[in-house]
Amino acid sequence: MSIEDLARANVRALTPYQSARRLGGKGDVWLNANEFPTAVAFQLTAQTMNRYPEPQPKAVIESYARYADVKPEQVLVSRGADEGIELLIRAFCEPGKDALLYCPPTYGMYSVSAETIGVECRTVPTLADWQLDLPGIEAQLDGVKVVFVCSPNNPTGQIIDPQSIRDLLEMTRDKAIVVADEAYIEFCPQATLAGWLSDYPHLVVVRTLSKAFALAGLRCGFTLANAEVINVLLKVIAPYPLSTPVADIAAQALSAEGIAAMRQRVAQILDERRYLVEQLRGIACVEQVFDSEANYVLARITASSAVFKSLWDQGIILRDQNKQPSLSGCLRITIGTRAESQRVIDALTAENV
């Protein structure tokens, strides 16, 4: 018997999530993971590495609650938003009995987290405009405990219609948890659902410091929900999810100065996004550039697989979306620096396809 034979059957059948770093590449223009393009400097101030950290660091919780305009008891901090996603599935879905539902094309970790735990995944593809198919969702809800909605959606970049989400919340009341994945909400803060928590006890919002806060390497995320949901999650989260250095830097990022700096970064990214979109729309091999509310754009490219490989060979690493439902011919491009955008523009302009 091999070691793999000892593993759970569902784990043996798993295909790991193909993260940007797992896919690799040897480029010098990294535009495939929706990271901020330059590093932000922080200095460690905590000098208590000999002690275990707080289970839920008070300074981080209170700072994030203030930033998100919620109560501290409505905030859980975790190792990235991905841990928050997994905690919700573990806490609310019974393997072999319950299901979760999501609407592709969207973020891939919902299914990976569910399959790892042994929870059934149901998919209801979005409509032609990438909005929710509410009748399709309603038809699949029996036995569903958690529904994931990503807004702005990754990789398409659009905001999900708020009225559709309200309809979904009414449809699932007393039946299922609805999770709004707001990893990119800093780029369109007017679209947040955090203010809806008082109206919908089954609404959960997941957030991160990885994008606009430029801290993807920190691995720090947040779950916003009513206290009853947070108390359930506290039963299954690891005792010390955030190390002392992570909590230290997160608290600095959430200070008044840190938030002001984040908003300056957002303004920079929005300017660069406008420039990139304008330039892409004038390139022969670019068939369509979709509107985006996030720090990336999705474009349909002639001979996209060949173009993707050509740019890869030039050290420009984009994200191929061809395998996602309804995204044939599409590449996702993270908004980088002006110099990085220009590399992409010049390379695409030179393509003869």
Curated annotation (Swiss-Prot):
Alphabetized UniProt keyword annotations: Amino-acid biosynthesis, Aminotransferase, Histidine biosynthesis, Pyridoxal phosphate, Transferase
Cofactor(s) needed by this chain: pyridoxal 5'-phosphate
Catalytic activity field: L-histidinol phosphate + 2-oxoglutarate = 3-(imidazol-4-yl)-2-oxopropyl phosphate + L-glutamate
A single MF term (Gene Ontology): histidinol-phosphate transaminase activity
Enzyme class: transferase
PROSITE patterns associated with the record: AA_TRANSFER_CLASS_2 (PS00599)
Protein's GO biological process: L-histidine biosynthetic process
EC number: 2.6.1.9
Superkingdom of this protein's organism: Bacteria
Pathway: Amino-acid biosynthesis; L-histidine biosynthesis; L-histidine from 5-phospho-alpha-D-ribose 1-diphosphate: step 7/9
A Pfam family reported for this protein in Swiss-Prot or TrEMBL: Aminotran_1_2
N6-(pyridoxal phosphate)lysine: modified positions: K211
Family: Belongs to the class-II pyridoxal-phosphate-dependent aminotransferase family. Histidinol-phosphate aminotransferase subfamily.
UniProt subunit comment: Homodimer.
Protein name, UniProt field: Histidinol-phosphate aminotransferase
Protein's gene: hisC
